[in-house]
Curated annotation (Swiss-Prot):
Cellular component aspect of the GO annotation: cytosol
Domain of life, per lineage: Bacteria
GO molecular function: ribosomal large subunit binding
Physiological role: Responsible for the release of ribosomes from messenger RNA at the termination of protein biosynthesis. May increase the efficiency of translation by recycling ribosomes from one round of translation to another.
Keyword Cytoplasm among UniProt keywords: yes
Keyword terms, alphabetized: Cytoplasm, Protein biosynthesis
Organism: Ruegeria sp. (strain TM1040)
SUPFAM superfamilies the UniProt entry points to: Ribosome recycling factor, RRF
Intracellular or extracellular location(s): Cytoplasm
Protein name from the UniProt record: Ribosome-recycling factor
GO biological process, one term: cytoplasmic translational termination
PANTHER family: MITOCHONDRIAL RIBOSOME RECYCLING FACTOR PSEUDO 1, RIBOSOME RECYCLING FACTOR
UniProt feature coiled coil, ranges: none
Family named by the database record: Belongs to the RRF family.
Amino acid sequence: MSEEFELDTDDLKRRMDGAMANLKTEFASLRTGRASASMLEPVMVDAYGSMTPINQVGTVNVPEPRMVTINVWDKGLVGKVEKAIRESGLGINPQLNGTIIMLPIPELNEERRRELTKVAGQYAEHARVSIRNVRRDGMDQIKKAKADGMSEDDQKFWETEVQELTDKMIKAVDAALETKQAEIMQV
């Protein structure tokens, strides 16, 4: 009989949480027709010789549901920030007002909303696959321990623990997807 097997469920949970955090980051990059400061996170500006996130060259605000403003701290960077936004692929047309760049967020049409819900679904499926891969790793560890002499009861206990953790995380992914799809389809 081997010594007592102890599965590191904290490691499995941490890895599953990582998949969930990645999903939330991907969801934040989807434009929903509502203004949000996070929609500019992937946009980088060539400032002072290096690529810099927009929130490090100015203050990003959301004064209205369909407007984002950026108050650029250095007047010399206003043109570069505007260019970075135009070239970002967000489909936003910046308007200059001194050192303030205004970004009116256009209304999404029905077809684009449906496309975005499909993309959100793909992101969620990638997260589910990542979570299932972590589950498989945990189950493989349990099988290895079983081969090394783990009792049948211990095997069932650990398999149940891993499955319950997986089910909980998959439900969280599904809930996040449902929320994001409702947000995208909201006119």
